[in-house]
Each structure stands twice: as C-alpha cells, then as structure tokens.
Amino acid sequence: MASLKDMRVRIASTKATQKITKAMQMVAASKLRRAQLAAEAARPYAEKMDAVISNIAAASAGSPASSKLLAGTGRDQVHLLLVCTGERGLSGAFNSSIVRLARERALALMNQGKDVKFFCVGRKGYEQLRRQFEKQIIAHVDLRSVRQIGFVHAEDIAKQVIARFDAGEFDVCTLFYSRFKSVIAQIPTAQQIIPLVVEAPAANAAPVALYEYEPEEDEILSALLPRNVGVQIFRALLENNASFYGAQMSAMDNATRNAGEMIRKQTLVYNRTRQAQITKELIEIISGAEAV
C-alpha cells in the first residue's frame, strides 16, 4: 500500500490537473461564443450561394459550355476526400469522428473499385489518416500558425483543389467536417463540392421565378462556381472551429468533474489509511504501557 506521503502527492497532482482542465474549459467557453456566431453567420451565405447556382444551372441545363465544376468530368473513378479537422486535441471525439466518417467512405469507395486520394486540412486528421493511407495523401495544409480563420485561407485551399481538378487528378471531391449543432452535439458531415450537386425541386414545391441573366448563365457560373468551392470550405472551417471549442468545453468539463470525483476517493482512502495508522500506533503505545 502507498505511504501517506505518496497519497498526499497524488492528491496534490490531481488537484493541479483539475485546475488546468477547469482553466481550459473556461478558455474554450470564452472562445466558443465568437466561433459559434461566425459559423451561424456563414451558413445563410453558403446556402444562398448554393441556391443561386442551382437556379442559374437549371436555366443553362444541357449547355455544352457548362463548367466542369458543375457538369463533372463524365467519370466517377477517382475520388478526392478533403478532410478538415483540428490542429489540437483534448477535444473529445471531435477529430476522430470526422476521420472515422472519411475512413468509412474511403473504404466503401475502394471496395467498389474506385481510386481514393486525401487532401488533409488540420494536423490531427493528417496524423490519423497517414497511419492507414499515407501513400494516398496528396496534400496537407497546416493551420497551426493561423490565429483567426479568414476566407483567404479557405480560398487558398480551394485554388489548390481546383488546380488539381483542372489537371485531371480526380473526378469527384467530397468535403468532410463537423457541423456545429450545440456544445454537446457536433455532427460529422460529408458534402460533395465537385462537381456541385444541384438538387431538383420537390414535386410540391412552389414555382420558382424565372430570371433573365446578363451576362449569359455560363459566364456567371464560370465566375461563381470556383468561389462557391471556397465558400463551402470556409463554412466548413468555421463550423469546425465552433465544433472544436464546443467539444473541448464539454471534454474539459467532464475531465474537471472526473478529477473532482477522483480527489474525493483519494482523500477518503488517505483519511482511512491515516486513521488506521493512528489506531495502530495507539494500540502499540497501550500494549507497551501494559507490559511495563
């Protein structure tokens, strides 16, 4: 059995850990609000961008001049999985849940005879995926030095992806990220961004107004589609940022409460051991006195 001194050291160490997890929880909580507002503000813009492009695409359906970002390459053989994760850990299952979804998609595609490539954004996803798919990772973007995510960072990633698409390196690109729902709920999400999926209107949907476009639809799409890739990636990065702080806040809260419970149990064991030791010493003193 450990000595009383060892027990005191262990209790002090657990209390120090509890202070750290509590501080990290408070920091995550302070950053979460701003990250959540940014993610929620980006959603309507990204959704409206999709709606506008869908409307214009419907007007130019069948045009031979349609952009490949909309029409695709005509093939479905090579898939690029754009996996966005965090740069840091201590956030529960935030990173692993995104990687798990991407890994499941990759294995399913490979079982169908498809070729799979990875474009990793974030250190944690890259470290996990390279254990199994190292030769299939074609690019890795590290954002550890970025203090605040801006559209310029998403635009740079989008340019790299589009350049590889134009070079014929892949046929389909799917974006993986974590959609922020609440502090305790972050939803791993897969979204195809190349070629853009244009959803057909529902049968009972209200009629959509018809517009005349100037310049021509194809010219508008050629300008909007590359930007839309950047917008969707930017949205994913903002959703990830909010999800990370939400997951970290929840994880550190659990860690703080677990540390408190551990301190309670350790203190109980310490007090019992100390009481037993005192009782033993008293018995020895009494026995010695009686012997005299």
Swiss-Prot record:
It comes from Bradyrhizobium sp. (strain BTAi1 / ATCC BAA-1182). GO terms for biological process: proton motive force-driven plasma membrane ATP synthesis. Belongs to the ATPase gamma chain family. Produces ATP from ADP in the presence of a proton gradient across the membrane. The gamma chain is believed to be important in regulating ATPase activity and the flow of protons through the CF(0) complex. This is ATP synthase gamma chain. F-type ATPases have 2 components, CF(1) - the catalytic core - and CF(0) - the membrane proton channel. CF(1) has five subunits: alpha(3), beta(3), gamma(1), delta(1), epsilon(1). CF(0) has three main subunits: a, b and c. SUPFAM superfamilies: ATP synthase (F1-ATPase), gamma subunit. The keyword ATP-binding does not apply. GO terms for molecular function: ATP binding; proton-transporting ATP synthase activity, rotational mechanism. It is a peripheral membrane protein. It is found in: Cell inner membrane. GO terms for cellular component: plasma membrane; proton-transporting ATP synthase complex. PROSITE patterns: ATPASE_GAMMA. Its main location: membrane. Keywords: ATP synthesis, Cell inner membrane, Cell membrane, CF(1), Hydrogen ion transport, Ion transport, Membrane, Transport. InterPro entries: ATP_synth_F1_ATPase_gsu (IPR035968), ATP_synth_F1_gsu (IPR000131), ATP_synth_F1_gsu_CS (IPR023632).
